[in-house]
């Protein structure tokens, strides 16, 4: 692999954090490489640091996409939530359901860590395009402000202010640190209570001021506005469970590097749930139902289903029933 192509993974990491969309991140990186290969060999050789050039171009493309994305969201049906990432065991290793993932798929290019938790991405989405790009370049990817200024097209001082403003937004929204085991336990208990249609148990797990946000994109049924309050959410969740089809299943999965849930019908992912936990309660639930945002999950569930179908059924020698 050439040194230029070796930058692809890092660029996808960068673009996903900037855009909150795997598909848009892939488009941005493809456009970046298209511009590189549109240059002559002499022009390419004249560039002292190809990696820096690629980063600058990709960041500016993302900056432009963020501006147009805001305009598109004015006509978006319902709430907009960033695209969820499948669990690292399926994607970060390049394996999907035990098979090699398509190397062109951006989902297996993203490093799963705290900086792309759903709560973090949602706060990023509240920033201006310039704030978001400056913050990600400096605070997440550790670029010096002099380089950030060159990329964003503003002064060093202006970029410091942008990053500082973004940092205040992050700190204002951050919940106190939660141990991974506690987070996983809360999500698991929520699943059990939801499966049991136990309203009281659900209320006990939810913050009284909790919020449930759904993104259907106008393509599937979804609440158009956030549902507020622990008791309302509990009753809403139980109402959904009572209407759930017999071919449905609720599964524990890792979503953006943290414990989450996935709803499937006939083995196909139809909703991905991400959670924010604070002070021993669930503070926010994001439910992504827009099928355009679930493509990596549907690929994964298809591979899981195929792997299951490929397994031989147990023969008589595996039976545990005593027929004597």
Residue ranges and their predicted role:
Residues 288-324:
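Low-complexity, intrinsically disordered terminal/linker segments enriched in charged
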Residues 2-192, 198-201, 205:
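Active-site-adjacent scaffolding segments
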Residues 208-250:
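A solvent-exposed, acidic/Ser-Thr-rich amphipathic alpha-helical stretch
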Residues 258-282, 286-289:
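Exposed beta-sheet edge and beta->alpha loop/turn motif
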Residues 252-253, 263:
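Short acidic-hydrophobic surface loop/beta-edge motif
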Residues 193, 243, 263-267:
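Short loop/turn motifs at secondary-structure junctions and domain boundaries
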Residues 190-196, 201, 281, 313-314, ...:
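N-terminal regulatory/sensing modules of transcriptional regulators
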């Amino acid at each position: 692999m050439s040194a230029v192509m070796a930058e692809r993974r890092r660029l996808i990491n960068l673009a996903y954090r900037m855009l909150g969309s795997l598909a848009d991140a892939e488009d941005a990186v493809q456009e970046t490489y298209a511009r590189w290969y549109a240059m002559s060999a002499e022009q390419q050789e004249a560039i002292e640091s190809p990696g820096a050039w690629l980063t600058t171009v990709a960041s500016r493309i993302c900056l432009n996409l963020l501006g147009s994305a805001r305009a598109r969201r004015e006509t978006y049906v319902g709430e907009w939530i960033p695209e969820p990432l499948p669990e690292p065991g399926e994607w970060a290793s390049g394996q999907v359901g035990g098979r090699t993932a398509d190397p062109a798929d951006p989902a297996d290019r993203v490093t799963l860590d705290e900086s792309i938790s759903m709560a973090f991405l949602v706060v990023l989405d509240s920033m201006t395009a310039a704030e978001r790009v400056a913050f990600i370049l400096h605070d997440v990817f550790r670029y010096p402000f002099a380089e950030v200024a060159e990329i964003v097209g503003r002064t060093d001082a202006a970029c410091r202010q942008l990053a500082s403003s973004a940092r205040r937004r992050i700190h204002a929204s951050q919940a106190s640190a939660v141990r991974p085991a506690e987070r996983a336990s809360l999500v698991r208990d929520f699943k059990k209570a939801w499966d049991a249609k136990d309203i009281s148990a659900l209320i006990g797990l939810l913050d009284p001021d909790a919020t449930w946000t759904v993104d259907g994109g106008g393509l599937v049924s979804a609440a158009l506005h956030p549902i507020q309050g622990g008791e309302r959410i509990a009753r809403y969740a139980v109402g959904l469970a009572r209407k759930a089809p017999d071919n449905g299943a609720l599964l524990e999965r890792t979503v953006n590097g943290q414990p989450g849930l996935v709803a499937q019908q006939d083995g196909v992912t139809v909703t991905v749930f991400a959670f924010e936990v604070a002070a021993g309660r669930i503070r926010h639930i994001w439910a992504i139902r827009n099928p355009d945002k679930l493509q990596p999950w549907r690929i994964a569930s298809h591979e899981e289903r195929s792997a299951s179908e490929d397994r031989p059924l147990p023969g008589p020698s595996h039976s545990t029933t005593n027929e004597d």
